[in-house]
């Protein structure tokens, strides 16, 4: 864990997919940097464990939101709730994602296809729709969305995931293009190979210890979330 530099002191941040992997690592780092966190994930127990870890490390007590991102009405209510409590939002990290089946496109059941699109793409649209007004009330609103090299569509059997990430990239670039005269910046971050549960599911024969841990890429998230970040509409690759 990097030592605190205070770059995010007092910043209010929403992180989705916060209970494990990259989301949990980013949450702990943001807390170490002084941010007040609103953590969203489906798994209550994992959120509570993260809460314990953040407070043990001296971070502010986060707000825990157990929520399935496919409950779009709940995402609408999130914006209203945050507006009432904080009156603004400084940082949005759209990290949550699911892999879906690695199988030929013609074999994918429609409901499975829809689930991957809902979580990886549509939920982020709904988050923007709900939270953009609050980001615009910040002195330096920052939105970061996690994508993947799979968005190129060059990998066989990755259809739903690839399409959902390609859609996410188009969404974020369109959103960023609308932000030119505002104080909000929106960017994409592609983590590359990282030691996560999703990576293990996608590449079961790979040695996890050969991959960098999620903590190794957290500096990039801090850079993109900080008030002094001037990047907008970019796809930033972790190297």
What role is predicted for each listed range?
Residues 11, 59-60, 88-89, 135-149, ...:
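Active-site loop of short-chain dehydrogenase/reductase
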Residues 98, 110, 136, 141-181, ...:
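Catalytic loop of short-chain dehydrogenase/reductase
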Residues 12, 19-20:
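Conserved glycine-rich cofactor-binding loop
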Residues 181, 188-189, 196, 205-239:
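C-terminal helical subdomain
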Residues 33-50:
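Conserved glycine-rich Rossmann-like NAD(P)H-binding loop of the short-chain dehydrogenase/reductase
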């Amino acid at each position: 864990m990097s030592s605190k530099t205070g770059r995010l002191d007092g910043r209010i941040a929403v992180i989705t997919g916060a209970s494990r992997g990259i989301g949990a690592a980013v949450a702990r780092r943001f807390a170490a940097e002084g941010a007040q966190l609103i953590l969203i994930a489906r798994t209550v127990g994992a959120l509570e464990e993260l809460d314990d870890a953040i407070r043990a490390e001296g971070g502010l007590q986060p707000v825990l939101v157990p929520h399935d991102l496919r409950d779009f009405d709940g995402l609408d209510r999130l914006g209203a709730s945050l507006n009432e409590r904080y009156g603004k939002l400084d940082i949005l990290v759209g990290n949550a994602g699911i892999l879906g089946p690695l199988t030929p496109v013609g074999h994918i059941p429609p409901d499975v296809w829809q689930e991957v699109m809902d979580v990886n793409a549509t939920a982020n649209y709904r988050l923007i729709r709900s939270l953009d007004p609050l980001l615009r009330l910040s002195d330096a609103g920052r939105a970061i969305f996690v994508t993947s090299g799979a968005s190129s569509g060059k990998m066989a059997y990755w259809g739903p995931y690839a399409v959902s990430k390609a859609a996410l990239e188009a969404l974020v670039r369109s959103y960023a293009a609308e932000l030119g005269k505002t104080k909000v910046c929106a960017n994409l971050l592609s983590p590359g190979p990282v030691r996560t549960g999703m990576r293990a599911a996608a590449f079961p024969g790979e040695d996890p210890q050969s991959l960098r841990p999620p903590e190794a890429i957290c500096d990039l998230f801090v850079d993109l979330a900080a008030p002094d970040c001037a990047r907008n509409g970019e796809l930033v690759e972790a190297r």
